[in-house]
Each structure stands twice: as structure tokens, then as C-alpha cells.
UniProtKB/Swiss-Prot annotation:
Quaternary organization: Homodimer.
EC annotation from Swiss-Prot or TrEMBL: 1.1.1.267
Name of this protein: 1-deoxy-D-xylulose 5-phosphate reductoisomerase
Record-level Gene Ontology MF annotations: 1-deoxy-D-xylulose-5-phosphate reductoisomerase activity; manganese ion binding; NADPH binding
InterPro entries: DXP_reductoisomerase, DXP_reductoisomerase_C, DXP_reductoisomerase_N, DXPR_C, DXPR_C_sf, NAD(P)-bd_dom_sf
Record: residues binding 1-deoxy-D-xylulose 5-phosphate: 125, 151-152, 186, 209, 222, 227-228, 231
PANTHER family hit by this protein: 1-DEOXY-D-XYLULOSE 5-PHOSPHATE REDUCTOISOMERASE, 1-DEOXY-D-XYLULOSE 5-PHOSPHATE REDUCTOISOMERASE, CHLOROPLASTIC
Residues reported in the UniProt entry to bind NADPH: 10-13, 37-38, 124, 126, 215
UniProt organism field: Buchnera aphidicola subsp. Acyrthosiphon pisum (strain Tuc7)
Amino acid sequence: MKKITILGSTGSIGINALSIIQKNPDLFKVIALVANKNFSIMLRQCELFSPDWVAMRDEKSAHILRKKLKHSKINTQVLTGEKDICALAALEETDHVISAIVGMAGLLPTLSAIHAGKTILLANKESLITSGYFFMKALSSSGAKIIPIDSEHNAIFQVLPLEIQKNLGKTTLEKNSIKHLVLTGSGGPFYKFSSSDLSNVTPDQACSHPNWLMGKKISVDSATMMNKGLEYAEARWLFNALESEIKILIHPESIIHSMVQYYDGSLLAQLSAPDIRTSISYAMSWPDRICTEVDYLNFYKINNLTFFEPDFTQFPCLKLAIDAFSQGQASMTVLNAANEIAVSSFLDSKISFTKIYEINMEILMSSCFSEPKCIQDILEIDRKVRILAKNKVSSLIF
């Protein structure tokens, strides 16, 4: 039985992971759950899974949860704050840690789990793309393992040789007869929109993905295709891939989740219905597979599968992320921080959809940070850029 801690249990990934655990109680046991401030969902999760520990980032939410658990006579211990979250990520009794906290807030807890030698099931791509070198170095020195949850990287992982699966980031694609990886993306809800149409889209429209059910932040990132740019960076680190070894392909139907081109001409792809439970369950059960109750593909009902190259003019955030990766770790940290503020501001209806790119581009172009020498440097860059981005948003409002 695998013992699980979930960082971000009240979000989309966490809720889906728990649904898989609920259907496979003989395979998994929940040890600890971590969330920000949604005590209502956390209370229900405690009632269903009886974790030993819970941590809420928000102190007020932790206080309310303690009262409700006591009233329900549930013995789960409630902690609060970043230090306690990092402690739960490193619990000795935990085998696997699902890293699903949204954004930069997931960095330190994920690193804590890595330093403790856990198997990390990674959904929080921001922790990897902002601290890539330090992240991969910590993996190597601690003996921790990493399995991606993102559907694209999980799809690639599924069709890679076992040697790479066991040693992500430590070997090269060429040594394993791989010519390149193909990251697919749906193009989001706006891939047919004109530039003028994009100026007027609403947060609700941006969060209405045609194929996937996701959280708000990643839904907006999908709509701008920033998400695909971040996934490009994630793939560069995870698979130790060169720039020439990653291709990006728009695939609106979201049936083929990614592909691996081998030197012998074989192109291996992972296909499934667009349901994140497939990749979560594979990460949780690897190297085995378990039942998820995800619908099977019915090829008689699939009229066609379409593909085309991404248009960087229509999706400038994608190009921005690819270029930022080539510039170094500081640039990726800057872009990630600026984007988190810009997306949050759009969701709060403070800025228009097209301003997300403008803010990202202006902050990235105007920032000049030395390459980070440690995690603290990354956190400091992140802190300063968030201030710059918030000031930029304010200047657009007033």
C-alpha cells in the first residue's frame, strides 16, 4: 500500500487524486493533506479519508477547521503556515507526495519532499521551471524520484524506455534512440479568434476550456498558451531535452496527449479521452495501471484528428516562454511571477485578456537579474517581480 501526502488537495488535481484513492482503498492510504484556505472541502476530505495530518496555509482557515473537526470528533491534527506545510511534505511515513499546489507557492514544499527522498508526483510545474537546476540537483543528491502528472509529460513518460522513466533528467534522449518529443496542445478556447476578438474575452470565457476541466489559473494559461510554454520548459528539464528535441503541435481534439519520435521512424503516442484522472492514476500506480472509470476512446465516434503549427503572432506568450527559457533561470522566474500576477488580475477583471501578454513582455524585457545561485535568490527575484507586476497592473487601471 502506497502512503500518500497531497499538497493542494482542495484543487482540481487533488480532488481527482482523492477520487482515485477512494476507488482503490486497498492500494493507497492518505497520510496528510495540504491546502490554502478552503476549509469546507478540506473538512469533507478529512471525513472521507481520515488523514493523520492537515495543514492550511491560511491561519484563520486552520482555526475554523480545527473547531469543525473537533465538533465532528475527527482526530486529524491541523497545522498552519509554510513551515508546517514543508514538514508534512517530508513526513517519514509518506512514500509518495503529490505536488499540486498552484504556482510558486508550491516551490518550497516540493523541494522539502525532494530533500526527504520521496517519490514526487509533479503537477506543480512552476516549482521546476523556476528552480530547474537546483530542483534536478536535489533530485539527484537525495535519491528522490519524479513522475509527471501533466497530461503531456505523463503521455511522454508512458511511452519512454524504462531506463529514462527510472532516471528522468539524468540521461539523454539521443542515447535512448529518441529524435524528438512532440508536445501537443489544444490551442485553448480562442485558437480561432482574431486579435480584435481576443481584446474583449471575459474570464468566464477563458476558463471554459473546450476539452478539459481545470482550475482557473491553468485555464487562462491554456487560453494564452503560456501553459504550453511552461510545459516546454518543464519538458526541457524533465527529459534533459535540447531545444531541437522538442516540437509543439496544436491538436484541438485533445486525444493525442503527446508523442515520442524514435530514430528508427517509429512515432509512439499516448491517446485517451481528455480526463486528467488517466495521467494522475498512472503516476500514482506506476509501474502498474489501475482502473480509473475514465471513458474509453471510441474511434467510431471520432470523425478526425487535426494538427497544425502554433501561431506565435496569435499566441505570443508561447514564444515568450520559449525565449525566456533560453535566456536562463532568472528570466523564467521573472516570467512566471509576472504571469501569475497578470492572470490573477485578469481573473479579477482588472485588466483585459490581451494585457496579460503585455505585462509579461514588459516586465521580462525591463528586468535585469543575475542568475540565481541558490533557492533564496529565486525567491527574492520572485518577490521583486511580483511588486513590479502589481505596479504595472495599477498603472493600467488608473
